[in-house]
């Protein structure tokens, strides 16, 4: 539970306060921004992707718990857990790619690496959307007390599934990520209350 809450906070602070690249800019401009401010870039990447990976592993554990409990939603939860683990691996790859952008020997190489990371990022948004939709569905089907969070997770999942078609720098993507954070905090709070 706490891992979800800490992950959300770390991700927000990392991406907003430290990460120097603006997702609304062209790939070459984003790569140049990372290379121009290495310290801020490293801190932003560690906090941003670190928080995201923490959230993904925590959500994977929640999904596994729902799956283990059995019931109507267990099959959806199993797929969600698998997807969250894949997305966490993709986030690690993106972290490595953007670290490589900072240390690239040429601007052209940095732009190529940045473009690859952004492409994987679009796929991750789709994956998070599908996994969150499935987790929300499994929560609703198990009827285990936090149905509002389950319903909200379904809405967030749908928003994130359509977000990549609009681009990473659009309001709908921002809305999806904000919703994902809120849903994750809701799941985290319920997990903490359940463990007490």
Model-derived regions: residue spans:
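Hydrophobic, aromatic-enriched alpha-helical segments typical of multi-pass transmembrane helices
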Residues: 1-196
